[in-house]
Amino acid sequence: MPYELITSENLDRIFVKLSKKDKLQFEILTRKIKEILENPQIGEPLKGNMAGQRSVHIRNFCLIYEILENEKAVKLLDYDHHDKVYY
């Protein structure tokens, strides 16, 4: 059973903008999110100040998320260029 998806208003705006500017990247992102909802463990576990979060790479961009096991949900936290997302 797939996990529920949780996003923020900020990510929703990013996704809407991406769907208009780069349809191919948006399609790839959408497929990757579906994969994550089916198997949240596919992302790379992060360390340091981002411990507990996971990332998947989509071209030069990274999608950061966390798994909320108690709620059977995946919360998307950030999506940005690789150089900017790791702060």
At which residue positions do the language-model features occur?
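N-terminal first-folded block
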Residues: 7-40
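Enriched for short, Lys/Arg-rich terminal
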Residues: 2-5, 16, 20-26, 58-61, ...
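Residues that form or immediately flank small-molecule/cofactor binding pockets and catalytic motifs
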Residues: 10, 51, 81
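Nucleotide phosphate-binding site architecture
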Residues: 12, 47, 86
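A short, surface-exposed loop/turn module that caps and links secondary-structure elements
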Residues: 31-57
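Charged, low-complexity, helix/coiled-coil-prone segments
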Residues: 1-8, 46, 50
